[in-house]
Amino acid sequence: MPAGERLPGAPAREERIVVHVDMDCFYASCERRREPALRGAPVVVGMGYEPDQTVGAVATASYEAREYGVESAQAISAALERLPRKADAPDASAAGYYRPVDMAYYESVSESVSEILHGLGDPVREVSIDEAYLDVTDRTAWDVAAGFGRHIKQRIARSVGVPASVGIAPDMSTAKLASDHEKPDGLVVVPPESVQSFLAPLDVADLHGVGPVHARALRERGIETVGELADADPYVLEAAFGERGREFHRRARGADSRPVEPRGKPKSLSRESSFDGATESFDRVREQAAALSGAVADRASRTNASYRTIGVKVVTPPYDVQTRAESLPGPVDDPALLEAVSQSLLDEFEGAAVRKVGVRVSNLVFSEREQATLAGFSGDETGDGGGHEGGACGGAGRGSCGGQTTLDEFT
């Protein structure tokens, strides 16, 4: 939808529609995406469970694993006491599948989710690898917000293969509470007229920003629920907790006025696209990469960004992520060069089956002035001052991928 164009019936700007997307047990969901046989089984992602390891912790536990008392940040030894490894007890009915943390892979999946979200919301605020806010005020209306939320969930599930919980509300704090309300794979819509009734019965500790220490202090003052916090005297709260007390009161009333804003300037710009299954037609791969290069170049131009590095990402079956990049003598804004370098970087993958291809620029420089092209620098058109850098993340390289992309790249 063009900037500034509103959907017929969309609310006025002051009636915001904010979406919070939270990927359920994200690391475990990624492992199930890679190993579909793990669906429905207890999955624990962490380090320290191998026989030669003595120290480690749980990064993520699936909901099935949580039923056995396994929790995030728990010592791996405690997790193993509650839920032994299937590899150690193959015949046990109560055993789980333990997998090592593979950040490169999780970041790749997160990038795919990010690509979808940036196409559905404007603006988008990514707060972590598995969580984001979208302002969709101009994209939908309250009477069809539930359908819009289902569309987000379905796009992520079908295109990426991981589940998400979605909360929709007039403000960021309430939207986050809504996404937590029916996990996993939930969808909760809280329209403006329902905010107070939704918030009031919730435990005060559930309110966004209220940690265990403040929750205990509030309970000592007789405040147990969000509704009681909303009814409290804001001056008394401010006297007890400072400005944070005022903020607690605003959020308890559904009056969180924070705008959905991106976190600073991006470190990279990228676009990527998946094929139906895996394609062995490299002409299709090159054609898609050319289109992606054009989209990235357009985004760089619109944001007054020049770039020192051009890279590509290729995902081959089953879900092996490989990246290649070339550094340039200096920052440029040159669409023709971007396409030429990205096509050159793809050469080594000719003949491979490809599930997904992506193009990115990084090492960005932002300026209001006219950007340079490579002709403004000494050296030849291949960027001789740089060279290739990259890495592959396959089965043997899980958890340690030299040159692998990071979350700030390819987003």
Curated annotation (Swiss-Prot):
Protein name as it appears in the record: DNA polymerase IV
Binding site for Mg(2+): D22, D130
Domain of life of the native organism: Archaea
Gene Ontology CC: one annotated term: cytoplasm
Listed HAMAP family: DNApol_IV
Family per record: Belongs to the DNA polymerase type-Y family.
Cofactor (UniProt): Mg(2+)
